[in-house]
Regions:
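C-terminal segment of classical bacterial N-terminal signal peptides
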Residues: 16-25
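Intrinsically disordered, low-complexity polar regions and short flexible loop motifs
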Residues: 43
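Short acidic, glycine/serine/threonine-rich helix-capping segments at coil-helix boundaries
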Residues: 342-347, 355-399
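Catalytic glycan-binding domains that act on GlcNAc-containing polysaccharides
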Residues: 48-277, 293-296, 305-344, 366, ...
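Intrinsically disordered, low-complexity Ser/Thr/Pro/Gly-rich interaction regions
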Residues: 281-282
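Bacterial N-terminal signal peptides that target proteins for export
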Residues: 1-11
Length: 403
């Protein structure tokens, strides 16, 4: 069977199961079994046989471990050095190169069809499941049903539960076989059920989409998903760059976009001093560890990687790992020695202090997000520090001394 005949959006086999979007969210405190019946009703409206839903929900109880994991708040904010350093290791690079060589024919065929370079499929595989060595052992139907009925994200996970039932209805696997992370991500590439349904590919043509044991299906699904969420050749996702002396640090932000050639005209070069591509594609410069750490240019494909996972540090990890799997050099500029995570309480204190200075007006949540970094940048400008939006120990000390 040629690739065009193989299912990508499950078009041929899902016509029976197509249906309307999920209805309104469930009221706080709804009984678990009652909640399951509401989800079943939504699923049957989308074509799932009632017997399939009944079998999937038979004896199902909420998973308290999933509830606990969902409610757990991180004690410390993530930093570039800790996150990327843990995701991009020499061992992971070497294994990625070995697996890319092992599956080269398949990966080259997928690149020709979908436009996604092999090293990116390998990088996602490496970051998501360490090349398939740990795909999670939670029962997916139980996990997503628990999250739908016992947490605040009812709409999202109710839909994921319906999509999991649709997967069962199409005989891709049994409830017991459908295992993944506590949040419902499945298989080598950790697809949510809705992602499986929309972007899954039966590359082998056996009538089933198997993201667990069929690497052709898993890799093709990843390539199809990436193309669907915006990947376009030929530029990579990102590259390390060197900034010229006097570069305006307030321009190093994802909200600032310029054509690649405009950054080149400002004196930005690739790390190692090679010229940037001659391109009019929109791009941004970021400093994930502040002005003393590495700088990167983000090309449009970085947004595609972010559409897979909304974490900038996750996307940086995938981009850096892909570059090194393809034989590129490690990042040349290391992070500063004091690139240490801030505790949640420390971020809350910082947000409160910035709010008293009328620089921060958003929710005090203990998260070092874009709005908090913007407020940090404003105060850095006021006190004469480099305005890179990163709260260094000196910044924190100066802020605590402010009256």
């Amino acid at each position: 069977m040629n690739s065009l005949a193989k299912t990508t959006l499950l078009a041929a086999t899902t016509a029976l199961l197509a249906g309307p979007a999920l209805g309104p969210s469930y009221a706080q405190g709804t009984d678990f079994q009652s909640c399951l019946q509401t989800i079943k009703a939504d699923a049957t409206r989308q074509g799932v046989p009632a017997a399939i839903a009944d079998r999937a929900f038979q004896g199902l109880t909420p998973d308290q471990k999933v509830v606990d994991l969902d409610s757990r708040q991180p004690e410390f904010s993530l930093t570039y050095s800790k996150y990327v350093g843990g995701a991009v290791t020499p061992d992971r690079v070497t294994k990625g190169q070995q697996r890319m060589a092992q599956h080269r024919a398949l990966l080259d065929a997928l690149q020709a069809e979908y436009g996604v370079p092999p090293q990116y499929i390998m990088a996602f595989w490496g970051v998501e499941t360490n090349y398939g060595t740990f795909m999670g052992d939670f029962q997916v139907v139980r996990s997503v049903a628990t999250l739908a009925c016992m947490t605040k994200r009812r709409d999202f996970f109710s839909n994921e539960t319906v999509q999991a039932l649709r997967i069962l209805a199409m005989n891709h696997m049994t409830r017991e076989q459908m295992r993944g992370s506590w949040a419902g991500a499945m298989g080598n590439m950790q697809f949510m059920p809705s992602t499986f349904m929309k972007w899954g590919v039966d590359r082998t043509g056996d009538g089933r989409i198997d993201l667990w044991t069929s690497l052709p299906d898993a890799f093709a699904s990843a390539a199809n998903f990436l193309r669907g969420i915006g990947w376009k050749p030929p530029l990579p996702a990102s590259e390390e760059v060197f900034l010229p002396q006097g570069f305006p640090l307030d321009q190093a932000d994802t909200t600032v976009e310029k054509p690649v050639r405009a950054w080149a005209q400002m004196g930005v070069k690739k790390a190692g001093s090679a010229a940037l591509p001659s391109s009019d594609e929109p791009s941004s410069i970021i400093l994930p560890a502040g002005h003393r750490g590495p700088a990167f240019i983000l090309y449009p494909n970085f947004k595609a990687v972010m559409n897979w996972n909304r974490s900038t540090l996750y996307a940086m990890s995938v981009a850096i790992l892909a570059q090194q799997i393809a034989g590129g050099a490690p990042v040349m500029q290391g992070p500063p020695a004091d690139d240490e995570p801030l505790s949640r309480d420390a971020v809350i204190d910082m947000q409160n202090r910035l709010a008293r200075l009328t620089l921060y007006t958003d929710e005090v949540d203990g998260l070092l997000g874009p709005k908090t970094r913007s407020a940090v940048r404003l105060y850095q400008k006021q006190i004469g520090l480099p305005a890179d939006g990163h709260p260094t120990p000196e910044f924190v000390r100066r802020l605590q001394q402010a009256r």
